[in-house]
Amino acid sequence: MKRLAAVLLLLAATASAQQTLIRTQKPPLHGSHWMAVTGKPLAATAGAMIFQKGGNAVDAAAAMIAATCTMWDTLSWGGETQALIYDPHTKKVTGINALGVAPTGATPEFYKGKGFTHPPDEGVLAAVTPGTPGGIMTMVAEYGRLSLKDVLAPAIEMADGYALEAQSANTMDRNKEKLKNWPYSKKVFLIHDDNPKHPGPVAGEIFRQPDLAATLRKLVEAEQQALKKGKSRKEAIYAAYDRFYKGDIAREIVRGTREQGGLFTEEDLANWKVHIEEPVTTTYKGIDVYKLNVWTQGPAMLQALNILENFDLKGMSFNSPRYINTVYQAMSLAWADRDFYYGDTYAPPEEPVLGLLSKDYAKERAKLINPDHNDPKIKPGDPYPYQRGVNPFPDLLRNWDTSKPPASKPGGTQDSGLRNEFLRATPSLSNDYLFAFYSGTTSVEAADAEGWAVSVTPSGGWLPAVIAGNSGVGLSERMQSFVLDPSEGPYNVVAPGKHPRVTLTPTLALKDGLPWLVFSVQGGDSQDQNLLQFFLDVVEFGMTVQEATEAPNINSFQMHSSFGGHDIKPGNILLNSSEPPWVRGELRRMGYTMTFEDRTSGPINAIMIDRPHGTFWGGSSNHGEDYGIGW
């Protein structure tokens, strides 16, 4: 009898294990020394190589960014980098703002004079100054352990030639007609003149970028020359930084940009700098959640958490109609504030950050959530009284209209779809919607046993990118996130030297004062929507990081798009195709216009630090090429 009982227990345990194994399409990643998770297998390998060289999580993250920049379909070297770093020595979380700024001459009048109602979403006039090179070098100089030569070695080897992956090859092929318009891009990407139908490289072909390789070697050369002169490791890396932004590399970027009709000046690059800054934070169920400031959309997730703290989400059950309705409206409230109040914190007017993140303000906003019906006309609130201030834009706030999209952009390309990271919901989503989850932006997560933890959301310069002369550097397309009219966002109106308000949003969470979760995602306006739900899946519903990356999400289109024509579709919701009929019926009754897809999230990547066991859990998206390596 005892033997039978033992057999039954063993069978039950085996069945339980099998159920656990089939809960996710990908297994969770485990490690005890270090972990690197990102959107490209080769980039994850670059991170692993740096760890094996003795680098820390910051070095590994920088190498992953550099490698991904060399592969083009999600970002390139002229884009922007945003990071959160936990330093185990200071026990502080620090933010890295390596976002470019609008160049000289980029004014509302300039773009309106060319017939635009918003800055363009591609081409040379869509470019802000390059930020990622400065971001990588600052991260390594201030928080890394290795030389720039070590950190850039994988990217340089790739620029010399690597076996092109299918996704990048397909992206080049899709954009071949546009790449023909820009001579330096054509030289790099359309290398087979004898095959006009498919002039780009194919999957498996060795893809070489000699101009980019030369530029990266110039950075290493500047570092090594400084070291020979007796400079410190940090000083030598900043010598490379100066060569990029103030030396011959900068001059070629400016020359190549202006030759193709761009606005960059040498002063634009020389005056730009990386900001090392204090992030913003809130608490949820005793967990400290950190985001970059309101020059990103990241604080909208914190606002949503503050609102949702007033509800029993676990009691509603996962993805029930009541839960979906509550989360949707909380996001709508937070993103309405994002659309109105968020902007560059280094340029006037000053944003009401304290009021926006006030718990009392969140309680008042939470009262607006209707448990029975969605409100498609949710408007921004007024956070100023919660920081003892007076709203400087009362008329714009009073007249804010969420019921209709802005006018179409004359002469623009807002409907081409492939550059937009998050497209408008339609009754039948096109393939462009699915491409949008793959194109533009990646996420980079790294952690090590020493205690370093890093979350990065680099982006910009994705295909079809304009390459700046013979530098090999592709230009960003981030100007499109500005507005030209204060009525569409008084804090985010374009001006020379100003950062656009971006969607890019790394996340770092502490438990008991120590790193617990690092996570981020690509997907434009959906980024913090999906990260919010990932976080709730882990905290409220006890999912592992792999389960939470694969869990079905909802996406709202009730906020203004940060891309193209800045469209808005109140009441539109994207749901997973697995939602049962009774859930669909309830949401229809609540006033939602529903669209369904098998994929409802950009690729979330995450690392959880398991302190009781001294190990790491990694999660990477089951869609696309996202990949992790741990040891």
Regions found by a protein language model. Give the residues of each.
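Active-site rim segments in enzyme catalytic domains, especially the processed small/beta chain
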Residues: 70-95, 112, 255, 260-265, ...
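Positively charged n-region of N-terminal signal peptides that target proteins for export
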Residues: 1-4
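Noncatalytic scaffold domains of N-terminal-nucleophile
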Residues: 18-45, 49, 56-239, 244-296
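Short, well-structured alpha-helical segments that form the helix of a local strand-helix-strand
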Residues: 58-64, 149-160, 244-247, 252-254, ...
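Extended C-terminal subregions enriched in glycine
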Residues: 450, 497-500, 531-532, 540-599
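Amphipathic alpha-helical
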Residues: 238-271, 364-398, 463
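Hydrophobic h-region of N-terminal signal peptides that target proteins for export
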Residues: 9-17
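Internal maturation/activation junctions in enzymes
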Residues: 313-452, 456-459, 598
